[in-house]
């Protein structure tokens, strides 16, 4: 497997580096910046799992650490403000750097701070979950939640580099592993059916090298899409398959009920059911999606939480993917994807949605 993927960006090109030697790879990335100040942003879970790693960072660099509570509540302007306070207190300049080590929450949060402190300072992402490695770290999207609305405030601000190491996945709980698989299945179902089939048959316990290949293949797919449509005007919208409903579920439900990859799985099932009902997708493809979700213990219905179609529809109206008058869904087809625009006043769709949940 190649060790590097180079991503072309209209903002700034960057490399995705595959390694099992995080310290050495980070040192190589920093180069002459080794003498600059570094702020490592992480969460309590990662910090306690890899405390020795952070101690080594402290020995080698002029480093500071900001440790967030785990979970989506840290993607907030209050947490951003706390990190600003630390950067200012330690006299961080525009030439100093942030390094995020954690899952998607940490990466999005740290990237947003980097994008906005002094109008932009450099940062490196080290994603530690499968979901963040194959999805949220790739493409430059950074941001935080606001007043219960998912990723409402943010930007596209690419990192200097992304360091991918599967060694972090050895401590990942099965539930979080399945959430990452959910995003890999998403891109496979829309863009790479051979990848989808490989994921369907994959045996995690006996095929570590196979996992590395699947991660590389998933990232390569997303890299290709992002390079063609960085600002989500066309092709990149396909990566929102499952996300209109998924983000609404996340907004309405406690994190304990549905993690991100689980909410997206339910969203994909509903999008696929809509596609079947409109003759865009064979029923056999929907059945295949349901079977593979069951294999990875991903939910396909909203049975864990009492959420109504009406409340979901109300949240849809605030989705940033919408046009002025329409709610946008991404529907899979036999050969790719299409968009479905639902009028924000179409209350008949609420009944349709209720029948699909």
From Swiss-Prot:
Q: Which InterPro entries match?
A: Dehydroquinate_synthase, DHQ_synth_AroB, DHQ_synth_fam, DHQS/DOIS_N, DHQS_C
What remark does the entry make about the cofactor?
Binds 1 divalent metal cation per subunit. Can use either Co(2+) or Zn(2+).
What enzyme category does the UniProt record give?
Answer: lyase
Transmembrane segment boundaries: none
Q: Where in the cell is it found?
A: Cytoplasm
Q: Which residues form a coiled coil?
A: none
Q: Keywords in UniProt for this one?
A: Amino-acid biosynthesis, Aromatic amino acid biosynthesis, Cobalt, Cytoplasm, Lyase, Metal-binding, NAD, Nucleotide-binding, Zinc
Q: Which GO terms describe its molecular function?
A: 3-dehydroquinate synthase activity; metal ion binding; nucleotide binding
Q: What does this protein do?
A: Catalyzes the conversion of 3-deoxy-D-arabino-heptulosonate 7-phosphate (DAHP) to dehydroquinate (DHQ).
Family, according to the entry, reads as follows: Belongs to the sugar phosphate cyclases superfamily. Dehydroquinate synthase family.
**What is the official name of this protein in its record?**
3-dehydroquinate synthase
Q: Which organism is it from?
A: Streptococcus pyogenes serotype M5 (strain Manfredo)
